[in-house]
Amino acid sequence: EGESRTALILVATSGDTGKAALEGYKNIDQIKISVFYPKNGVSTIQQLQMATQEGENVNVCAVNGNFDDIQSEVKNIFSSSDISSKLEEMGYFLSSANSINFGRLAPQIVYYFKSYCDLLKNREITLGDKINVCVPTGNFGNILAAYVAKLMGLPIATLICASNSNNILTDFLNTGRYDRNREFHLTISPSMDILISSNLERLLYFISGADATATWMKSLNQNGYYQVDENTLTEISKSFCGYCTDETQTKKTIGKYFHDYNYLIDTHTAV
């Protein structure tokens, strides 16, 4: 209320965020939304969900490249004062539905408190018991929300970072070296097909502060990798561990759960 400009929401998606954002913002006054997705990097269902989206204020664009390429360009747009000034003249301002906007992460923090309360309600734990949380992730957003929940006092022992064949986060959590100079894999869990995990920067900021994080991000941009110091890795290891799996094991897990529980889990949950 009181804002005369129109919000232009830019969304880079590896699959799931795009449809959710389009549906959430369709036909809302003073909002326009543009979603960009990798042309060959989402499932057919995800592509159709976005391409057939109804709404007078929505736009969807397939990009030749992967999610990292798109996310980097969206960040460049946000950091460009020239683009911001030009949009201002036209009556627009930029916003995002990605986790580049912390407003995306804030509601996710609630998931973990709700889950803990459910475990208490079902008498599976008692108040104060610590739990382990396993999150399939590529961009490190939802698992960072779990970490914030832990900082807020939720009794979480270990945050388990589950990766697919693009296992850059697993390598980082085990070695402290983040190296995106590697092969990019298109997998059956496309929402996790990411090599530049933008929310990891936030974790490093929480643990090591602005100056060290800025140095590491500069190295990532210039050289494609960085190595954190031993103290930082030790501190991260107090809360996180990382594991990865391949396509074969992911499919086996889907089959096992369907056979044992008559429940079809999706490919990301299977990771």
Which residues does each PLM region occupy?
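PLP-dependent amino-acid enzyme catalytic core
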Residues: 1-271
